[in-house]
């Protein structure tokens, strides 16, 4: 018997339906559905994970940071709210004992490979090297049968290792840096406030903060524009002055006066025709930007809808960077099926009449998947939600457009001379629709048809207009623009960028769904980290590790090498952080808990003057000690251990010195008198 492991239950159902030579037998185990099917004389079990079944967690409870000793555990242990995964793990464990062969049929990308790898190793209890791999980019019967007939001999260990490394690095960065920020605030204010950052979150927030600073520091500058309003054939037209900005008001007045005294005439008419080639097929980033422009969908919403269309079998796998459509996709068959839908029939018939279907392609490639395309499976009424209908329409029209003829646009530029000055009037129209006939609803071309102008023609002026304006600050990023910027900077992956943006919203670092504004909290976090530990938010460091993950995938680096290097780099960063922990905590606590709450840790009363004994830090060495709040009038100080959390006890010992509890990073606690001459001091200080 063979066990096929899908990524999600509805994908398991699709695979069972495609591969079974009879009607699939649906069964359940611990309430989890699975399917028994027969193919080519073999009995197959098709079961599923439910996304990630395993996550990372510390091997032991440790208080503090850094922490690097982690392991894979069931996801319901690693994360809250994932209890539903327990039954899926149990089901796979039982089913694995009934079979001799394993096939992974999760999504073919790094995340899918990690899901398959961990399910095999931990739930099924087998060596992942024994499993074969179904590789597909769409959930149609023909694609799934093709994947079955062309099984890969193993899972893609390059992808699996890169995915595992990414998970570990993200855990190291996210958990350790978040603990560091939280501990810093606790040290400064005595309050536990969870604050987080991450390997990609930090650099992403940084470029948003940089834009916010540009906007805040922007000083508007006045300028003037000059327009020539005239009439021709009963219509009004507005021509713009040759300089788009006049910086001096007096110059603007002079130009207006000179134009009014002149007799404006047409000095040139320039007509150009340009071919506009069809757009390239959709990669995920382009789809997210177009869907935001057309429908206002956030990048995450677009990805979620595209994933749903994929799982329903209507479009191909969405997490792709490819802008190419390989020839092994049966374009003609897909278009023949799309022709059954009235809204696409006219365009499909045009394409079916061509001797060859050759798509326009972009430059970007993806080794795992082609560009996004409709599968040719036709949705029935009720199959799609309203938002799914919108995105499906965009995907279909884009697919049809890439095979169509170029559009031809005509642009007209009329030059009007008024004395020594020039004005320009521009128009543009589509003279041959080509691909715009099918995709034009998603493309913004201005259609401005001008009447015929002749050189030397006198212009009937209505008004010479001078308008005062002010320069505007840079625009805030839209969600789609953030995804594009992350792509350009090499931050995150096609699959993670949308979620990183959502996380920044959830953390309270940014706000505004269309125009993203960084909150005071987001500004303060970046300002503080820039000041004390800038490497935490380094775009270069993040990009460097992204490239190393690609090298793991290509087999040119091992995951162990990259994980070890990341550990070393992060250890150094956290060492610097600890030296400035109190200062960082004070800065952050001012905005997180309020300035009034930022107070030093008081461990007792001074036996000499009655002042507060507080934890202080040496500015040169960064080492902590206890001193009197009335310094320099009172010079009482005590040394204190440099490790562990200090907890006051309200008790005293030798000569009125306070007794404190030191809580070690492993959770152990012990009491110590702060007087260095106390008989217990030396024993406890080692």
UniProtKB/Swiss-Prot annotation:
GO cellular component: chromosome
Domain Topo IA-type catalytic, residue spans: 156-574
SMART domains tied to this protein: TOP1Ac (SM00437), TOP1Bc (SM00436), TOPRIM (SM00493)
Region (Interaction with DNA) location: 196-201
An individual GO BP term: DNA topological change
Highest taxon of the lineage: Archaea
Coiled coil: none
Active site: 317
Gene Ontology molecular-function annotations: DNA binding; DNA topoisomerase type I (single strand cut, ATP-independent) activity; zinc ion binding
Catalytic function, reaction form: ATP-independent breakage of single-stranded DNA, followed by passage and rejoining
Cofactor: Mg(2+)
Record-annotated Toprim domain positions: 1-141
Site, Interaction with DNA: residue positions: 52, 166, 170, 319, 507
Residues that coordinate or bind Mg(2+): 7, 107
Enzyme Commission number(s) of this protein: 5.6.2.1
Catalytic EC class: isomerase
Keywords: DNA-binding, Isomerase, Magnesium, Metal-binding, Repeat, Topoisomerase, Zinc, Zinc-finger
Zinc finger residue ranges, C4-type: 606-634, 653-678
Keyword Zinc-finger: yes
Subunit note: Monomer.
Function: Releases the supercoiling and torsional tension of DNA, which is introduced during the DNA replication and transcription, by transiently cleaving and rejoining one strand of the DNA duplex. Introduces a single-strand break via transesterification at a target site in duplex DNA. The scissile phosphodiester is attacked by the catalytic tyrosine of the enzyme, resulting in the formation of a DNA-(5'-phosphotyrosyl)-enzyme intermediate and the expulsion of a 3'-OH DNA strand. The free DNA strand then undergoes passage around the unbroken strand, thus removing DNA supercoils.
Family in the record: Belongs to the type IA topoisomerase family.
HAMAP family: Topoisom_1_prok
The protein's name: DNA topoisomerase 1
Gene for this chain: topA
């Amino acid at each position: 018997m063979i066990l096929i492991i899908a990524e999600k239950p509805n994908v398991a159902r699709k695979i069972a339906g495609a591969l079974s030579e009879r009607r699939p037998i649906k069964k359940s185990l611990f309430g989890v559905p699975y399917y028994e099917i027969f193919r080519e004389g073999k009995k197959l079990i098709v079961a599923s994970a439910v996304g990630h079944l395993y996550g990372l967690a510390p091997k032991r409870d440790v208080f503090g940071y850094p922490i690097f000793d982690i392991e894979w555990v069931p996801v319901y242990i690693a994360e809250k709210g994932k209890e539903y995964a327990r039954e899926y793990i149990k089901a796979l464990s039982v089913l694995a004992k009934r079979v001799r062969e394993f096939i992974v049929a999760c999504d073919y990308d790094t995340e899918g490979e990690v899901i398959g790898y961990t399910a095999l190793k931990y739930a099924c209890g087998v060596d992942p090297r024994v499993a074969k791999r179904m590789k597909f980019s769409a959930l149609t019967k023909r694609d799934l049968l093709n994947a079955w007939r062309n099984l890969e001999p193993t899972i893609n260990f390059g992808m699996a290792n890169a995915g595992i490394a990414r998970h570990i690095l993200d855990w190291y960065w996210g958990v350790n840096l978040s603990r560091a920020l939280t501990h810093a605030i606790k040290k400064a204010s005595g309050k536990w406030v969870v604050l987080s950052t991450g390997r990609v979150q930090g650099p992403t927030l940084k470029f948003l903060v940089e834009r916010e600073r540009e906007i805040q520091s922007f000083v508007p500058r006045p300028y003037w524009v000059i327009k020539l309003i005239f009439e021709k054939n009963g219509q009004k037209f507005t021509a713009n002055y040759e300089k788009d900005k006049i910086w001096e008001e007096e110059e603007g007045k002079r130009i207006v006066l000179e134009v009014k005294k002149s007799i404006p005439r047409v000095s040139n008419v320039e007509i150009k025709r340009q071919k506009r080639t069809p757009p390239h097929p959709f990669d995920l980033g382009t789809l997210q930007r177009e869907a935001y422009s057309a429908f206002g969908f956030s990048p995450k919403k677009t990805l979620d809808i595209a994933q749903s269309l994929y799982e329903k079998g209507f479009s191909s796998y969405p997490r792709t960077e490819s802008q190419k459509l390989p020839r092994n996709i049966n374009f003609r068959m897909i278009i023949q099926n799309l022709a059954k839908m009235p809204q696409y029939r006219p365009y499909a018939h045009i394409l079916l009449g061509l001797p060859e279907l050759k798509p326009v392609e972009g430059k970007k490639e993806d080794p795992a998947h082609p560009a996004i395309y409709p599968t040719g499976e036709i949705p029935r009424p009720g199959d799609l939600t309203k938002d799914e209908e919108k995105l499906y329409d965009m995907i279909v029209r884009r697919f049809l457009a890439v095979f169509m003829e170029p559009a031809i646009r005509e642009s007209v530029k009329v030059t009007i001379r008024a004395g020594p000055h020039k004005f320009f009037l521009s128009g543009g129209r589509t003279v041959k629709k080509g691909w715009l006939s099918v995709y034009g609803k998603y493309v913004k071309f201005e259609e401005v048809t001008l009447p015929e102008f002749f050189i030397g023609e006198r212009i009937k002026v209505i008004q010479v207009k001078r308008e005062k304006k002010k320069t505007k600050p840079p625009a805030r990023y839209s969600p789609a623009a953030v995804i594009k910027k992350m792509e350009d900077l090499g931050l995150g992956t096609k699959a993670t960028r949308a979620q990183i943006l959502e996380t920044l919203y959830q953390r309270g670092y940014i706000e505004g769904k269309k125009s993203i504004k960084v909150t005071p909290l987001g500004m303060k976090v970046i300002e503080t980290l820039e000041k004390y530990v800038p490497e935490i938010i380094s775009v270069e460091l993040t990009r460097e590790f992204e490239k190393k993950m690609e090298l793991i995938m290509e087999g040119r680096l091992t995951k162990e090498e990259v994980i070890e290097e990341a550990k070393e780099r992060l250890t150094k960063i956290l060492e610097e952080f600890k030296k400035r922990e109190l200062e960082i905590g004070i800065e952050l606590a001012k905005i997180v808990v309020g300035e009034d709450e930022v107070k030093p840790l008081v461990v007792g009363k001074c036996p000499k003057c009655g002042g507060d004994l507080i934890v202080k830090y040496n500015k040169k060495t960064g080492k902590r000690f206890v001193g009197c709040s009335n310094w320099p009038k009172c010079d009482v100080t005590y040394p204190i251990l440099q490790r562990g959390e200090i907890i006051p006890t309200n008790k005293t010992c030798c000569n009125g010195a306070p007794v404190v509890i030191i809580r070690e990073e492993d959770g152990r606690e012990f009491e110590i008198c702060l007087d260095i001459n106390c008989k217990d001091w030396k024993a406890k200080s080692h």
